[in-house]
Amino acid sequence: DLIFGTHVHADHSLLIPKIYRDGCRAATIISENSKQILKDMALDSAYISERDVLVINSQHNKNYKPLYSASDVYKMLEYTLEKPVNQKIVIDDELAFELIPAGHILGSCQVKLYFTIDGTTKTLLVTGDLGNKIVGNRFVGKYQQVEYADVVIGESTYGDRPDIKTGIKERKNDLDKFKSIIETQIHEMNGRVIIPSFSMSRSQQLALMLYEMYKDSDWKPKIYIDSPLTIKIFEDYEECLEGQDKIDFDNMMASNMFTFIKESEDSKYLVASNEPCVIISSSGMCQSGRIRHHLKRCIPDSNATVLLVGFSTEGSLASLLKDNKRKTITIDQKEYPCRCASYSLKSLSGHAPFWQLVDMYT
């Protein structure tokens, strides 16, 4: 048996440790430079699961068990193998596989399986999430087209949304909007811009955007990265990146434009302070993490802006924040009046838009 991980985003990889908790001992196959990030994300997930179960059990007199523990994560890692892309790897006479770049996030890949029975070979392609091949995001690698497979199990995130535009024009407009919000809110109004962001990929992309906006500017905003997991992934990127991406990332990290907040006490101090700044914190959907404390502080503040930069599921706190007509927001059973400004940048998606999906699949 084999388990294939197309990429390390939580919705595609963070149930794998549970499979090992339940007794599985199959090898997990992922692309090169993915294992350390998978480890960091899975350990963080285990910690959150164990912590939340303790709270729920205590408050409701239950005896729930966490999805998995840190020991299950380490068991998974014992069986996790990194494999190179664009190389057909033969398992036996009947099965081979190839990992092909998907252009979604760092290390994302499509999985092409070759099944040979009675001398006849058929192929199955599992795309995982596919990136935007026209605009693309930094530190990702380019999407690579697979010319043919007998059967395709393909992503369709925007398969019913031809109205969503994420092209070059939309990206430029969003970058202009991003810069305008920062300079109006921070430089002119001495306020704050709070950015809920996914720890993996989106936060690093935002940091590079900010660096490139202001590296040659006389005025630079104060920028905080307030998330232990995000910081670990920044460190992983320093080890994983190669070529021009590595050069650009190292230049960004050497710029001293960013302050990384690891300790909880420093995060609490930042929440309580009135310093005009940009704060990037996780989680992107605002369902957990330090971002919730920043939102409690900033949602009632008319001199604060929440900038939403990613997908949010219906009913998540992030989706509620996108509704500018809401009068109140409830966080941790406490209601807060909505006085902050709220904006969305829609072109930063790591997913292929509708018309690219049509082109990829036809």
Named regions from a protein language model:
Residues 118, 143-146, 270-273, 298-300, ...:
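Solvent-exposed alpha-helices and their adjacent loops that cap or buttress functional pockets
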Residues 95-99, 236-244, 357-361:
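Short, surface-exposed amphipathic charged segments that create phosphate/polyanion-binding patches used
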Residues 142-160, 244-249, 308, 314-340:
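Metal-dependent catalytic core segments for phosphate chemistry
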Residues 329-360:
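Generic long, charged, amphipathic alpha-helical segments
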Residues 3, 123, 156-162, 254, ...:
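Short, basic, glycine/proline-bearing loop/turn elements
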Residues 178-319, 329-330:
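Hard-cation-handling environments
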Residues 9, 171-175, 259-260, 284, ...:
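A conditional alpha-helix N-cap/helix-loop micro-motif detector
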Residues 1-4, 9-13, 19-218, 222:
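His/Asp/Glu-rich metal-coordinating catalytic cores
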